[in-house]
Amino acid sequence: MPNEGIPHSSQTQEQDCLQSQPVSNNEEMAIKQESGGDGEVEEYLSFRSVGDGLSTSAVGCASAAPRRGPALLHIDRHQIQAVEPSAQALELQGLGVDVYDQDVLEQGVLQQVDNAIHEASRASQLVDVEKEYRSVLDDLTSCTTSLRQINKIIEQLSPQAATSRDINRKLDSVKRQKYNKEQQLKKITAKQKHLQAILGGAEVKIELDHASLEEDAEPGPSSLGSMLMPVQETAWEELIRTGQMTPFGTQIPQKQEKKPRKIMLNEASGFEKYLADQAKLSFERKKQGCNKRAARKAPAPVTPPAPVQNKNKPNKKARVLSKKEERLKKHIKKLQKRALQFQGKVGLPKARRPWESDMRPEAEGDSEGEESEYFPTEEEEEEEDDEVEGAEADLSGDGTDYELKPLPKGGKRQKKVPVQEIDDDFFPSSGEEAEAASVGEGGGGGRKVGRYRDDGDEDYYKQRLSPKMPRTLSLHEITDLLETDDSIEASAIVIQPPENATAPVSDEESGDEEGGTINNLPGSLLHTAAYLIQDGSDAESDSDDPSYAPKDDSPDEVPSTFTVQQPPPSRRRKMTKILCKWKKADLTVQPVAGRVTAPPNDFFTVMRTPTEILELFLDDEVIELIVKYSNLYACSKGVHLGLTSSEFKCFLGIIFLSGYVSVPRRRMFWEQRTDVHNVLVSAAMRRDRFETIFSNLHVADNANLDPVDKFSKLRPLISKLNERCMKFVPNETYFSFDEFMVPYFGRHGCKQFIRGKPIRFGYKFWCGATCLGYICWFQPYQGKNPNTKHEEYGVGASLVLQFSEALTEAHPGQYHFVFNNFFTSIALLDKLSSMGHQATGTVRKDHIDRVPLESDVALKKKERGTFDYRIDGKGNIVCRWNDNSVVTVASSGAGIHPLCLVSRYSQKLKKKIQVQQPNMIKVYNQFMGGVDRADENIDKYRASIRGKKWYSSPLLFCFELVLQNAWQLHKTYDEKPVDFLEFRRRVVCHYLETHGHPPEPGQKGRPQKRNIDSRYDGINHVIVKQGKQTRCAECHKNTTFRCEKCDVALHVKCSVEYHTE
């Protein structure tokens, strides 16, 4: 660099070395200008113009370190406005250098730096977009190729889809893949257009031309899976895959596979034809055997008959059979013998022999000369030879049609095999038995043989078994027959496996309800052949049949060597079936009258307080029972409890108070801190006394518990409360019956889990209540009910009957009960009707399977408000109504009319519409929710104090229940009733204020600590003078000052340290 542009003075050189920046080091100059320099930068920076247009520094400092590497950015000084020559200093005008204003120069340099950064980021972004665009093109090519392959596969599979179910499923799968590929192609195309808008230009067109050339190429192997189309492979690859050649070209010798001959008697595919063919074949072979034996026994030698030529192998001599072939031949003879023996019993199910389970149907293409999978042993062959010879003796020698005859029962080595029927529970009726006499009369010691009317009579035997013969109908046809004809009594339906039993079954079912009903079976099973097994063994069915004419077997016809053998009784429990004739008609019945006698309202003639109403249930007898057994239990543990009735009422008041004033820990009721301290509780009972009573609370004697009753610890209290709840039942006609959950999270055998309930874990109680929520009767659920009364009606129905009997015993009359589908059945309605009551309830589908109502699927397709109904001869009506879903209701006290209109919102019309509703649905909705209302009232202010023992939750529930019942009576008979919370508060205040015992005055305990947050807040901590000296909270010396806010003694000098954290 020339040195004429540098000032000659040493001072100027030093300043230029400190302040000026060369053009080649523009990055450092920009950083220093942004940071503001060191405060000594002058106003002007001079550059000298060079002929090549590059600006050089006016300063050259020898001590400056050169920059390593090429420059990242060159500043174009021509883009920066220079200072006018007239405004330059006189010393600079004669030097011929460019002079710039410092602010202008800084702005110009920063602007060029920003532009360079923006261009660099733009270039980097274009590179990324270009890479993404290439990836999109690859995806587009792959997706297009897959679509072409899928279209070809669809063209190949479409002609075969109508004939094959498997190919139809594959075709559906391919179409779903095509739809997914089309959606993917749309997304890729949209992304391609977006990237084209960013890139634009010729490069995109070049790529598109390249992609269009690739579309004309032949597609490669399919990658859609083996279910779509096999991959094209060469002959070499096929040999390697099948194991005929190694990958190195070596041929592998293959063993000839001999397919075993499969023999099976297929009863469902032409069994009679099979018997005829086998009989003919057996006749021909046994005829040849007879001729051979006759030739061997002849005295003179005879010419042996010519060997029988095989049709499959003509012009060949008969070869000597091997040992295995002889065994196979004897085995076939055995099959033929069995076929001849059982030809008279065509259609009867027979027991499968052990070796028949391994047999499979003969495959197509199997020759007769191939070996079978089963070969009998030598012992079996020897035993069967005698039987075959005896059968061959009866064969005629001519070529006439062969007549089947019974095999002779004699024989030296005849094996006796007991015949076992398929239906073990089938026994002939007593009317079919004939008279018999003992065997060996006078000789003694003879055996006894049973003799029945059908022995030896083939026609009558078939007539007796005809109800059990399978019918060649489909399962769907059999179910339609049972629904339309009520006279058919079926004991079982036997379903054969479908043809595609191993194929995957679709999840789509014909019904949408849970359970094993006919509406839940798939279509493949509905079209399967099935057998209808009817109750043909019943003696009544024989006598009722007019075409039945029993044969008169007199005692003279029975040989004297026979005696009667009684069949054993059947183990199968016969259910009593009620056959009803249903018709479409409405129920016309008058509602029940309700209670006969009026309730004793003497107590409610005067206004009663909440406590007095509660003590109708928790009277002196109940409280004395609790006090007695609690003291007894404490005494057995060596603790002197000394509980009294007054003290228990105070304890019960604290329990009720915890329902609407809950704290995380029950001990917090007795704390002295002002945020949780409860004056009413702490003044009524000491904390430790409450804990002692709660841990020893009992209502039964542990030494005399019923081992069968799982709730025997609570049974005395439950029984007494049931008596009092039933005594004060309001005068109602309609009562609901439902279940009630008590929360419990411990371990117990009776704990239940009910999904979808507000309380999922806990004990379940069966409750009968009025429509407003007064619980009349309750029992805990403990699995198997120890009370076996009415158990023939089921668990739910027996509980309803027990409740109705208890209600009728306490208040004679006729009532209307409402319950849900767990309890409802036609048998329960009949039983309640016989007791003079009426009932209404939703019913499950399997409880009314014989009622010919319109199906749920058909009703759902119709408009809302459509219903179908039927009535039987006993006054029970069943109605199926379509609302949001299809609901089925059965009733013996409410019919269809009068119809009412209810408001429903229509999603289709986007407005509320009027829907007609049968009267029995209205009755159910109006009177069903009594137990749920009681559950809501109790759960709203449930006691928050819990115990660790399993019986603490149901015990406290009993107290909550009677408190809720007392409030229901208060609402019924009081002219100015209060809500449940106010009623509860009045009971609590009365018990704690009347029966509470305030603690005796004694030594004052340690004062509670002040809140730490208010100690260090620095607000209103004023030091004031106090009357007497106390210990300073900081230095623990005596002082007459204290902090008014913290209420602690403090010196003035200690105040700052105490209030500083």
From Swiss-Prot:
Record bears the keyword Ubl conjugation: yes
Pfam families: DDE_Tnp_1_7
Ranges of biased composition (kind: Polar residues): 8-27
Main location: nucleus
Positions bearing Phosphoserine: 158, 429-430, 554
Annotated keywords: Disease variant, Isopeptide bond, Nucleus, Phosphoprotein, Premature ovarian failure, Ubl conjugation
Protein name: Chimeric ERCC6-PGBD3 protein
Species: Homo sapiens (Human)
